[in-house]
């Protein structure tokens, strides 16, 4: 009996382009999953003899002496498999990495997943409250932490009952390991072991690779369960199918934080899987980024809108050449067509620069432009293969016409199956037909059949590529029970023609309170990550505008904000519209 079968081999290192070609049609047919695995996944020892195993794949963009070939990575990952098991983590337990980007970060990801554990990356900007929430929602049992970030993790982990011996120091740059802690190198000292194997489709679909936090609109961040099936499907579509027409060897540079969904599995697994070199930046800085593109002759460039804005507005764009780039893409948030055109001027003639759209819940891109298709209209492209989509109106009724805006709902092999242990959110997000309701408003053009983002049903604020949920900020401000009676947070555009935003709080003081704007901002600064700061300011009101049912009328606040920005008004009495 024939069966469809799809494999995510988290170790991926051993698959040379030649061997990997057998996996490109991973939704093809086979008589037996076990035979399929045997065919495409030869033993690690056999693959280690392949000549392409010695090629350097991972490169430290800040220290050229640090590189990793497949052979080196293979050994490190097999050692980590043994180390994770020796450390006492059980199969299915979740481990977290708290670190800035590094070539060894991906090895830890691969080693942990290969050992049958589940990855979860935390934002290095987290404060203690955010770290504790992350630990609770992902059920992290084990940490690998860079020394500079240890204090927040120790306090958060201790308060959530994680013992000290489950925290390892990620001293990849020779940093000193604090007394009483073990270096992550301890995990490399227990020999080498092979990875966990999955030999049936249903287990593949229900076994997680990662638990990734995603901002919600009704509370704190939720945790999306990315499965092996999701990861394999995404790699097959993005790293192979969408680039099938590319005739050169891709060379990339990654400025993105490695906890982000855009790097899982695109940065952690796909480079070893394809064999294409990638340069990893520890932290983003504009000049080293541009210099790296020129020096390493980067061909495939992925950026986010704030980065595009920084590039086109900086004189550094004239100092460094981007002419090596042969295709570029922008994602995470919408990019206005004007900025897209300005960025294209910096590239060589004929180079494609397009946009994509996706979510944490879709393992990344859900729409894109397959190379060499071009666009200058601000579209986010076409749906990736094997994806079902529907549009619904505000009443949840299907929209069947082109050029009509509606909430886009998707299902397919890259869509995660659930939020981790959050039945309420699952019921609100997935319908009875299995469609994920994204909260994003799109339409499909009748002439070109291209998709366009026009609005967000969700009230997420996009700050430097990160998602900020207004309810999280509102909840933090309402902790000042003696000073704040009511609050609403919205996002203001950083520039008139930009989609980057700044959080602004509208605050109602309690009687007798004299809390100032600085005092309100301090409530956020002291407890939440820096990108969640109220850079859009604070406006004091007598009353927050609400509908008869109590819903905050954020549309009204945005209208006021538009007027205030023009008139430089800092206070306004709230009038509730009829």
Curated annotation (Swiss-Prot):
Q: Which lineage ranks, top first, belong to the organism behind this chain?
A: Eukaryota, Fungi, Dikarya, Ascomycota, Pezizomycotina
Q: Does this entry carry the keyword Ligase?
A: yes
The record's listing under Pfam families reads: AMP-binding, AMP-binding_C
Give me the residues that bind AMP, please: 211-222
Give the free-text miscellaneous remark of the entry.
Answer: Gene clusters encoding host-selective toxins (HSTs) are localized on conditionally dispensable chromosomes (CDCs), also called supernumerary chromosomes, where they are present in multiple copies. The CDCs are not essential for saprophytic growth but controls host-selective pathogenicity. Although conventional disruption could not be accomplished due to the high number of the copies identified in the genome, the high sequence identity among these copies is likely an advantage for RNA silencing, because it allows knockdown of all copies of this gene simultaneously.
Return the similarity comment.
Belongs to the ATP-dependent AMP-binding enzyme family.
Annotated region (AMP-binding) at 472-551
* Gene coding for it: ACTT5
Asked if the keyword Transmembrane belongs to this entry, the reply reads: no
Locate the coiled-coil region(s) and give their ranges: none
Name by which UniProt lists this protein: Acyl-CoA synthetase ACTT5
Protein function = Acyl-CoA synthetase; part of the gene clusters that mediate the biosynthesis of the host-selective toxins (HSTs) ACT-toxins responsible for brown spot of tangerine disease by the tangerine pathotype which affects tangerines and mandarins. ACT-toxins consist of three moieties, 9,10-epoxy-8-hydroxy-9-methyl-decatrienoic acid (EDA), valine and a polyketide. ACT-toxin I is toxic to both citrus and pear; toxin II the 5''-deoxy derivative of ACT-toxin I, is highly toxic to pear and slightly toxic to citrus.
| One record GO biological process | secondary metabolic process
Q: What is the E.C. number?
A: 6.2.1.-
Disulfide links within the chain: none
Kindly state which keywords UniProt assigns to this record, in alphabetical order: ATP-binding, Ligase, Nucleotide-binding, Virulence
Tell me the pathway: Mycotoxin biosynthesis
EC class: ligase
Question: Which GO terms label this protein's molecular function in UniProt?
Answer: ATP binding; CoA-ligase activity
